[in-house]
Amino acid sequence: MLKRLANRQNGFASFSCSSVGLRYGRTNPSTKRSFSLFQSVADTFLTVHEASHIPWIVLVPLTTMTLRTLVTLPFSIWQRRRILKQQELRKLVQPITPIIKLRLAAVTNKKSRNAARISSNGSFMPLQLQNAGVLTPEQITLLAVKETRKRQKKLFKKYNVPLWKNALLPMVQIPLWVTVSMGIRTLTETQLIESFYPSWFSALGFSSFDLSSPLVAMPLLAPILVGTLAVLNVELNGRLMFSSSLSSQGIKTISRNSTRVQEAMTSILNVSRLGCVVMLAMSSQAPFLLSLYWISSQLFSLVQNIILNWIYPYQR
């Protein structure tokens, strides 16, 4: 009886120790299967850091540049060249719209004259009841736009530049950004102090700051850099969006802020600006290592957009 009671107490003690170990020690992969990808990213960072002895403040930007160059840069170049091809094809389709409008207007005028002649010889009837084929100017514009889009879609498919492929870059870039961010966040759940600093960096007085917490010595440094680079990216992309809407098609028109395209692009820019404010607030409370990844990613995007706009400009 005493032996059975002792075995039961030993089993309870071993269970308590194992539960404490799972809580405060290394995370058991079986307990968080849905976040195993983030843990793998954190373990990869830790393995590379211990094997190469590269400081964290160098390893994270270097990894960012490598991933963006190998993964997202080819998609960005591919998308930029595809958009340029789409713009060239739009120039071919654009003259179709006024031609279709003229044809529909001519048919409508002919039918309306016939209807007016019948009403003058006989009893008066409303135009809508006399001839259902008479189109209003709004209907003519709508039919012309639909026909133009139909021909544009066929032309894009013929040259293998459909519009749905423009969503491939966000589908690759956003999951990559989220995965690396959450992996670094998992890495900084415990205290992370750099031990491989070079001598010149130690002389600046930053040889022992905690990378898993915000930068206490200069708390506004990371938010200012993240916010500034994010705003520059948004405004640069916005300028390219507005400048390439009609002028890239070789058509000079007066700016109309009331059009649906202009309103949609303005809404996208406003949401992006709001996202910059959110990132600025998050970086003020995020670990410095995570803010460093955001800074390097935004900087890479800014330089990439400037270079691509110089090599493959939207306006020709």
Swiss-Prot record:
Segments on the Mitochondrial intermembrane face: 235-274
GO aspect biological process, one term: mitochondrial cytochrome c oxidase assembly
Parts of the chain that traverse the membrane: 164-184, 214-234, 275-295
Record localization: Mitochondrion inner membrane
Gene Ontology molecular function, alphabetical: membrane insertase activity
GO cellular component term, pick one: mitochondrial inner membrane
InterPro entries: YidC/ALB3/OXA1/COX18
Keyword line: Membrane, Mitochondrion, Mitochondrion inner membrane, Transit peptide, Transmembrane, Transmembrane helix
Spans within the Mitochondrial matrix topological domain: 185-213, 296-316
UniProt key word DNA damage: no
Domain of life: Eukaryota
Membrane topology summary: Multi-pass membrane protein
Miscellaneous note of the record: Present with 468 molecules/cell in log phase SD medium.
Subunit structure: Interacts with PNT1 and MSS2.
Family named by the database record: Belongs to the OXA1/ALB3/YidC family.
Role summary: Required for the insertion of integral membrane proteins into the mitochondrial inner membrane. Essential for the activity and assembly of cytochrome c oxidase. Plays a central role in the translocation and export of the C-terminal part of the COX2 protein into the mitochondrial intermembrane space.
Protein name: Cytochrome c oxidase assembly protein COX18, mitochondrial
Source organism: Saccharomyces cerevisiae (strain ATCC 204508 / S288c)
Lineage: Eukaryota, Fungi, Dikarya, Ascomycota, Saccharomycotina
Gene symbol of the encoding locus: COX18
